[in-house]
């Protein structure tokens, strides 16, 4: 499961600066959910292909109301949920009484805790870290988060060892993909060029992991129980590895699913909605672990900024998406039309996602959800060969030529699959990285229409072709050498 990293420490020690460094953002992907303090921020980081959830817990001031009182709130919850705790101190201010109190509580929690001395710019790192060894938390990692100094070493020493070595993925090289394409064009049979290892993988043999997420009280609990209570076979309730999330294997229409329930444990027959204890960590982990995400929104409240924040995390994770508008029953036609207008206005950027209007309480529209879930999963895991992708790319270029870059036309050579769930198309060519964003969006939409991809984001990656003459001297031919010799002798006589 994706590890959680909590940043803790006194106010103004640089937690937000380090948060932005690790997540490569200026703000959090998910923030300001009910039940959370406003200075809590959540973000997603990727280190050498390994994903982490970063939590900025806000300042803990041990001198104001007491460390115990402060840490008993949301910051303590984040520490309990975290796999790694980065305890940040201010190297310029030195060791403070609040640091001692926080360190004592972290030692009692027995978490993987690492001491980070920030604001060491302009200082000797060893001298800056010396005072903090008395906290008894092991080595001190000096950094300057505002300038990025020491952050790479911190990641290398703390985060990378935590996840261990990632198995090396077997990918089709550029030469293999190019050879496969031209072999298909010429009708030749090139052994090994048809990406045979992928033929052994059939996504239909695996259960679809389906996560139901949304803000509190939008009906996730009711929808979960409605799904489990209708014509399907529930195998058993199996606690998952995510904190408080429940993995529920089930079968519907002879298709296996694993329902990732983020609403907590409940009795199967209970469908009454209660105020849910919302956990951002639990929700983000469920999204990362799912194949398809059902995002539930309240028809009576419309699309809120919190819904859009959660939607942004789903898209950044590359997960397939089905939008569920719940509590549709009992609304007047005028109110329904208004809701649909707002959905069109605020969700125009996810036009690939199916939208379902349901009543989880009464069951209307719930059965149709699985049609879109299957469609999204099949589109996200579909295998498309190099020949087909290159043909679509050429059709797109014929319909709308690539623009000129520095007076030269961008040349698209060939395309091949770069990954699945979400689908990734890799386009090779000259100057392709200089293409405008508008043309990149055009190519993405063209591939989506041609492949009929629905319910899942699609990503386009661009790779420059190598110049075979780069770094080589321009050698003259024997004929050119003779001409050059005659020209030089003529100039000397003149």
From Swiss-Prot:
Binding site for GTP 1: 9-16, 56-60, 118-121
GO biological process, one term: ribosome biogenesis
One of the record's GO molecular function terms: ribosome binding
Domain KH-like: 382-466
Alphabetical UniProt keywords: GTP-binding, Nucleotide-binding, Repeat, Ribosome biogenesis
The family this protein is said to belong to: Belongs to the TRAFAC class TrmE-Era-EngA-EngB-Septin-like GTPase superfamily. EngA (Der) GTPase family.
Name under which the protein is recorded: GTPase Der
Gene name tied to this protein: der
């Amino acid at each position: 499961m994706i590890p959680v990293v909590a940043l803790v420490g006194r106010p103004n020690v640089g937690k937000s600066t380090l948060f932005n460094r690790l997540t490569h953002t200026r703000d959090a992907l998910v923030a300001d959910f009910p039940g959370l303090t406003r200075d809590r921020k959540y973000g997603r980081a990727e280190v050498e292909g390994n994903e982490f959830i970063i939590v900025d817990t806000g300042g803990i001031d041990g001198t104001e109301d007491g460390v115990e009182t402060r840490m008993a709130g949301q910051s303590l919850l984040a520490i309990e949920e975290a796999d790694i705790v980065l305890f940040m101190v201010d190297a310029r201010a030195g060791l403070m009484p609040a640091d001692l109190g926080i360190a004592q509580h972290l030692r009692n929690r027995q978490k993987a805790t690492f001491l980070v001395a920030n604001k060491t710019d302009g200082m000797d790192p060893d001298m800056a870290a010396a005072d903090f060894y008395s906290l008894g938390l092991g080595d001190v990692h000096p950094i300057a988060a505002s300038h990025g100094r020491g952050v790479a070493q911190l990641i290398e020493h703390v985060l990378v060892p935590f996840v261990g070595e990632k198995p090396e993925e077997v990918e089709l090289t550029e030469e293999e993909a190019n050879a496969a394409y031209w072999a298909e064009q010429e009708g030749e049979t090139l052994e090994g060029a048809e990406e045979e290892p992928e033929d052994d993988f059939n996504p239909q043999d695996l259960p679809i992991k389906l996560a139901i997420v949304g803000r509190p009280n939008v009906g996730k609990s009711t929808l979960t129980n409605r799904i489990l209570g209708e014509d399907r076979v529930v195998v058993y309730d199996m606690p998952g590895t995510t904190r408080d999330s429940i993995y529920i294997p089930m079968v519907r229409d002879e298709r296996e699913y694993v329902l990732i329930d983020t609403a907590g444990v409940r009795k199967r027959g209970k469908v009454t909605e209660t105020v849910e204890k919302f956990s951002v960590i639990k929700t983000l982990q469920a999204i990362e672990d799912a194949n398809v995400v059902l995002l539930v929104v309240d028809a009576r409240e419309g699309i809120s900024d919190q819904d859009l924040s959660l939607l942004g995390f789903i898209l950044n994770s590359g997960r397939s998406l089905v939008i569920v508008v719940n509590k549709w029953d009992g609304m007047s036609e005028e109110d329904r039309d208004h809701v649909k207008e707002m959905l069109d206005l605020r969700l125009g950027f996810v036009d690939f996602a199916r939208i379902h209007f349901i009543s989880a309480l009464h069951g209307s529209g719930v059965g149709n959800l699985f049609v879109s879930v299957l469609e999204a999963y099949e589109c996200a895991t579909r295998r498309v060969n190099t020949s087909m992708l290159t043909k679509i790319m050429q059709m797109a270029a014929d319909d709308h030529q690539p623009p000129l870059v520095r007076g030269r036309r961008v040349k698209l050579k060939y395309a091949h699959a770069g990954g699945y769930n979400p689908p990734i198309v890799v386009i090779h060519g000259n100057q392709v990285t200089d293409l405008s964003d508008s043309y990149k969006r055009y190519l993405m939409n063209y591939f989506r229409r041609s492949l009929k991809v629905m319910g899942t984001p699609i990503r386009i990656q661009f790779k420059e072709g190598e110049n075979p003459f780069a770094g080589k001297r321009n050698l003259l031919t024997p004929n050119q050498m003779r001409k050059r010799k005659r020209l030089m002798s003529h100039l000397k006589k003149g």
